[in-house]
Every structure is written in C-alpha cells, then in structure tokens.
Amino acid sequence: MKLSVLSLASLASAAALNAKVLTGKSLTRRADFCDQWGQVTTGNFILYNNLWGQGNADSGSQCTGLDSSSGNDSIAWHTSWSWSGGAGQVKSYANAAYVFTPKQLSALGSIPTSWSWKYTGSDIIANVAYDLFTSSTADGDNEYEIMIWLAALGGAGPISSTGSPVASPTVAGHSWDLYSGMNGQMQVYSFVASSQTESFSADLQEFIMYLQSNQGLPTSQYLVDVQAGTEPFSGSDATLTTSAYSVSVA
C-alpha cells in the first residue's frame, strides 16, 4: 500500500515555544514531554515531539524524551506513541534537529552521521528517516526536501508522482529506491532503503551529490535543516528508541 507523507519542516520549526535548555557535557534521561509542540534543547540538538498531524487521527497520543547526550553532536532519545484512524496520514514527526549555520551546497564538505535505533510495538505503519531541507537563500522558504528512509514499516511509502522509483542507486554503501514527487511547491526526493537498516553510518553529503549529478539539484541551494526521526501513520504501543545518534555539518 502506497502512503503519502506530508512536509514537516515549517511546522517543526514553528514549534519554538517554551523550550527547556539543558547544558553540560554529559546529560542523563529527563522526563518525557507529551504536548503537541514540546521540545528540549541539548548541545547542538533540539528534540521535538512535533505532533503536527494529530488532528488526522481518530485517537492517540505520543510522548518523547531525552535519554542522554554527550558533547554537542551526540544524543540518545526515544518516542512512544499509539495512533489510530486517518489512514495514509502522518500524525507526527518526533525528531532530533541539528542546529547549524545554513551552508551553500557548493561549499559543503561533509555531513558525517551515525544512527543506531530499534522499533517495538504492534501493527506499526511508520518510517525511520532523515529529513533534509534546502532553500535558495539561507533564510528562505524550503524548496527541496531530501528524505533518507532507513526503514519503511508496515507498508509506509514516500511522496511519489508515479508510485514507482525513478532510480535504484547505491549510495553510501547501501542500496536504495529513489522516489520523486511534489509537496505543494516543494520538490521531494526520498531514498528508501532496500532493507531495513538499524545501524547506519554514512556521509549524508553523498546523497546530496547524487542528486546534484543525477536529478539536477542546484549547487546554489543552501542546506538549512538536518533532522532525524520517525513519521507514524498508525499502530499501538510503539516505541522508537535511538540508542546513539550523531551528526555534524562541515
């Protein structure tokens, strides 16, 4: 079953309300937050609950929490949810958003990352995915969305104008199906892993370079957001646990 994923960037970034700031080189678990736009800041990360699509559900809830952080670029966290109804509609995008100065793609050096995670629950339809956004200016509207799906659980699928991949490349040592489609005025590219990858290490710059060479992504664009999280459609007693996540932009 092919499902549509809506863009999350503007709603996620608009959620800067009542942020709780944590400091220190090493932090341990804090209480979960369950409000729609709940967030916590630690190091170079903002951890969002981001229940932007909860109105699409007949019932459900979701809570997110910080488990630990080390330095500025490494975090462990979890999110737990149950959602029913609203078939084919994303309910949220709990994610760890990396805070950095927007950088033009032509000047990007690397985006090294690693992510170890696991999912538990019943009847889960969801993804586990990076979400990158670019704009023609450092503070402009998002024009391109680049998703990197490490898992498509229960039949979840990306935005696609045709329902079929436009290519099946090998990038960063893994095989992917690449989908292309529009979300309003924004071009969306989604790399969907051929097999579920629960321990992932790569340079995300390789995905950007592939799109520049093969799909015409302009090098004049600015990278403005790097996020990693999960988009649930439906399921019960589900928990995504990120035991270790790191990223940086150089």
Swiss-Prot record:
GO molecular function: cellulase activity; xyloglucan-specific endo-beta-1,4-glucanase activity
Organism: Aspergillus terreus (strain NIH 2624 / FGSC A1156)
GO cellular component: extracellular region
Recorded catalytic activity of this chain's protein: xyloglucan + H2O = xyloglucan oligosaccharides
PANTHER family linked to this entry: BLR1656 PROTEIN, XYLOGLUCAN-SPECIFIC ENDO-BETA-1,4-GLUCANASE A
Top EC category: hydrolase
Keyword Heme: no
Family per record: Belongs to the glycosyl hydrolase 12 (cellulase H) family.
Residues that carry a glycan: 72
Cell compartments where the protein resides: Secreted
Protein EC: 3.2.1.151
Protein name (database record): Probable xyloglucan-specific endo-beta-1,4-glucanase A
GO biological process, one term: cell wall organization
Signal peptide interval: 1-19
InterPro entries: ConA-like_dom_sf (IPR013320), GH11/12 (IPR013319), GH12 (IPR002594)
SUPFAM superfamilies to which the protein is assigned, alphabetical: Concanavalin A-like lectins/glucanases
Keywords: Carbohydrate metabolism, Cell wall biogenesis/degradation, Glycoprotein, Glycosidase, Hydrolase, Polysaccharide degradation, Secreted, Signal
Function: Catalyzes endohydrolysis of 1,4-beta-D-glucosidic linkages in xyloglucan with retention of the beta-configuration of the glycosyl residues. Specific for xyloglucan and does not hydrolyze other cell wall components.
